[in-house]
Structure formats: C-alpha cells, structure tokens
Amino acid sequence: MLDLKRIRNNSNEIKESLNNRGEKFDVTVIDEVLKLDEERRNILVKVEVLKSKRNQVSSEVPKLKKEGKDVSNIVAEMKNLSEEIKGFDTTLAKIDEKIQYIMLRIPNIPNPQVPDGDTDEDNIEIRNWSEPTKFDFEPKAHWDIGSNLNILDFERAGKVTGSRFTFYKGLGARLERSLISYFLDTHTEKHGYTEILPPYMVNRTSMIGTGQLPKFEEDAFKISEDDYFLIPTAEVPVTNLYRDEILKGDELPLKHVAYSACFRSEAGSAGRDTRGLVRQHQFNKVELVKFTKPEQSYEELEKLTNDAETVLKELGIPYRVVRICKGDLGFTAALKYDLEVWMPSYNRYVEISSCSNFEDFQARRANIRYKEDAKAKPQYVHTLNGSGVAIGRTVAAILENYQNEDGSVTIPEVLRPYMGGKEAIK
C-alpha cells in the first residue's frame, strides 16, 4: 500500500508512474482518493472545533452548579455537540473505508531502475551463466522423460485429482525431496537464513498484507467455511510472521528461508506451459524472505538474488537473470529480477525464481515497523523475497538438461549425497 501523504504531496508524479506501469491502471482513482482525503481532513477540523467547544462548555458546568445556576441549557448544548460529533465520526468511518478500499487496489510505484516495456519480451537480460545445453540426439521433454522412467505420473494424478497435478514416484520423489533438503541446507548453512516451516493455510488479513488480496482472489484456493486460503507461496505466512509488530533496528536485516507446498488456481493460464511440471496447481518451493531497513534493501536484493543463483550454478543448470520491465512487474514489486533456466524442449528460458524488493508496500499493508532504539519513532521496514528456488521446475530442468540418449538422467554431483550416492536415474 502506498503512503497517503506521498500521494497527497506528489499526485502528478504518482499518476505518471502508474500510467507507465503497463497494467492499464485507472489513475483517476488517485483524484478520488485525494478528494476523499480532503473531505476527511475538513471533517476532522470541524470535529476538533466541536470537541474544543464541548470541553469549554463542560468545564463551566461545575462552576455554575456551585453558584446554584440552572445548567439544563448547557447540558442540552453538550448533548447536541456530542450528537454532532458522533455523526461526523460515522461519516469519517465511511470515508476511511472508501479510502482503504481504493488504497488496497493501487499497485506499487516502480523503482527508477525498472525499464520501460509492456510484456516479458521487453525484460532486459542482466547476465547469464553457462551456454544452453546442446545434444547430439533429439532431446525429450521432461514429462516424457519422467513418464518413461516411471518417476512422474501425470495420468494417474489426473484420475485422482485433476489436470495439472502430479504423482512423484520412486527416484522422482527422492529427487524432489533431495532438492528441498539441498536448498534449505545451502541457504541456512552458507547464506545465513533462519529456517521456517510455516502453516499452509492463512487468513484473509494475511493475504491482504502481502498483496495477494483483494486483486488476485480468483487465483487463490479458498476454504470457504473458515475464510482461510491455501498459500500461493511461503512469502505470505513468513512475511505476516511480523504483522502488527515493531522490530528492533539492530536485528535487521532478518533473513528467513521456508519450504512449503504452494497452491494456485492459475486462472487465465489455459494453454500456457500446462503440460508437465512448469505450471501446476500444487507445487513445492523454497522461499527466501528478508526484512530490512530502507537504506539496506537494494543491496540486500542483490544478495538475495545471488543466493538464489548459487543453487542453480551448483546444480549446473544454464540460466540467465532478467530485470523485469514495468508492464511485467506485477502488483506489489518496486523492482524485480527473474531467474530463468534453459529448457531444451521449449528451446527457451523459463522462469524459476522471481526476486523482488517491495520497499514499504507490503509493510504498510501488514503494519510491520522497526525502531532504531527505544526513543526512536517507528518506521516501516522494507520487505524482499525470492524463490530459492521452485522445486518442480528444477526437477524439470534437471531431467531436460541432464538427459542421456539411452533415456537415463545423470544426477547433478551436488545432489548425489542426498540421493544415496546414485549417479543416474535409469
């Protein structure tokens, strides 16, 4: 959520930033917010005048009573003033509700580093690692490799649940589990993150706090009876871990890593990468989340992105890093990098991680602040997160990049200790 004071003082600048964001955002709502804000402030002035008058009149009552004078008119006036104040309070509550409704639907302001552009084709490659994998045979897609090796079963998952679900079997299940352990071990032992195992369901307030709601409710799986939501990413519970709290400045940055299952309806994605493991309704992911001071956040974003890159390098999977343009930035991020791995069957790079700085956008929604010391004024933290990385897509990338002509798949060396010393899946 944006700072209302910032909108008040820089409305034209904010309109321009949102106009260029590529989401076809209706900037006239900024004028609506300003109008409501002005109305609210005018009413607050009137309320203060009325309260001052009521206090003044009220202070005269004891003196007049002591003098034996009739105070019925003054008491009646006090009652009228109180009723008038109560009416204004009701009006203020309605205005606040309208302002909140609009503010929750205004996207974040892009950082000046974000390139112009409308679609993912306008994203800018920052760097790449290793050349795309070449084969002297016709490579297969990961869904065929997995099915042939009997380690992925899409057909039976479709029978048991529906489309875009998967059974991992045998060494496929072990590969998935090995990646989870390897990612968690790397980020905790080498990169200094504290591991969190979060709930897989959160309440509506948590989804609002990280920006999934109200805009993306159709993409979420909801438990209707309790108004709980299955998490689309561990970002939601881990960020909300400190909702409505004031952190200590000397504890920042806080760095957490969390493994979780993730659940997404992927509404509107029909026909887009829906075969195989790339776009599932349920998938596993290891998430990196940071809470920082404002002046630390962009340096910490670079570190977080490098942490995610480390596991891809150690796995030996070719990848690139792209800076996301304004039109592809999404609702909550101020600046975002995507890590994309090479997928031979697609003959292109496929996103495996998004690393974002939200600045104070989520912190304002979730009311997460910090104080430098006991006497300091609380300030909003900056929140960051990134996949470290998506497990299913990593399995897909390993199957495709490490496939052999005989149909087997070589296991990356870094995973072999987790795979019982096995060198290949046959």
Swiss-Prot record:
Chain sites annotated for binding ATP: 264-266, 351-354
Residues that coordinate or bind L-serine: 233-235, 287, 387
Descriptive protein name:
Serine--tRNA ligase
Q: What is the lineage of its organism?
A: Bacteria, Bacillati, Bacillota, Clostridia, Eubacteriales
GO cellular component, as recorded: cytoplasm
- Relate the protein's function as given in its record: Catalyzes the attachment of serine to tRNA(Ser). Is also able to aminoacylate tRNA(Sec) with serine, to form the misacylated tRNA L-seryl-tRNA(Sec), which will be further converted into selenocysteinyl-tRNA(Sec).
Q: Enumerate the Gene Ontology biological process terms.
A: selenocysteine biosynthetic process; seryl-tRNA aminoacylation
What Pfam families does the annotation carry?
Seryl_tRNA_N, tRNA-synt_2b
Recorded hits in HAMAP family, A to Z, give:
Ser_tRNA_synth_type1
Q: What is its EC number?
A: 6.1.1.11
